[in-house]
């Protein structure tokens, strides 16, 4: 890096929130907190056993709001980057928590949904929802008697705000991936899209991802250590411009 950046796109995955105590989906055995993905993260699972699915996300929602779950140094550094950079910072996250927002980031795209929101199964109306969702709980905002569900993108469903994401990737002059495995598409392909439009690319991870060869620069270690260091470097270049 030797010149200031004006359009930075940051992709974050489970690795950035793991340091804050958020348990992650284990792709190698298809389990999420000892539940089969087919049972708790698919439309079919919800149709088959809505009580199980609601209970699963209710527990995750309660955990997220526990006072012990806080944004870590990586989240805070990205919030500082957005506040201080003479340019635009877009955070695209695969995570369903609100730690980026609590860390100070405002321009956040949740491509997999948000745990603290609920959605009407019929109208797709989305509302803020910090309490448990009960089976049989109807939509509060429309007249259609339809079950409320977590505002989460399940396997087999379309990711959210993809048009905005690809527009941001086209404009990016720096693309940073933090805490991602590089095995879940379309997110795993974002580095290639950004490179095609001329962005410098950096990977920050505990270990090389499945797409590490796409990155021009690699930094391996804890996100809470590596992200603040990178942000300091970017802002130092910015002040010299």
Swiss-Prot record:
Name under which the protein is recorded: NAD-dependent protein deacylase
Compartments where located: Cytoplasm; Host cytoplasm, Host cytosol; Host nucleus
Subunit structure: Monomer.
Keyword NAD in annotation: yes
Cofactor(s), names only, from the UniProt record: Zn(2+)
UniProt-annotated binding residues for Zn(2+): 120, 139
GO molecular function: histone deacetylase activity, NAD-dependent; NAD+ binding; protein-malonyllysine demalonylase activity; protein-succinyllysine desuccinylase activity; zinc ion binding
UniProt xrefs under InterPro entries: DHS-like_NAD/FAD-binding_dom (IPR029035), NAD-dep_sirtuin_deacylases (IPR050134), Sirtuin (IPR003000), Sirtuin_cat_small_dom_sf (IPR026591), Sirtuin_class_III (IPR027546), Ssirtuin_cat_dom (IPR026590)
UniProt record similarity statement: Belongs to the sirtuin family. Class III subfamily.
All copies of domain Deacetylase sirtuin-type, residue ranges: 1-237
Signal peptide from the UniProt entry: none
GO cellular component: cytoplasm; host cell cytosol; host cell nucleus
EC number(s) per entry: 2.3.1.286
Keyword Signal recorded: no
Main localization, broad class: cytoplasm
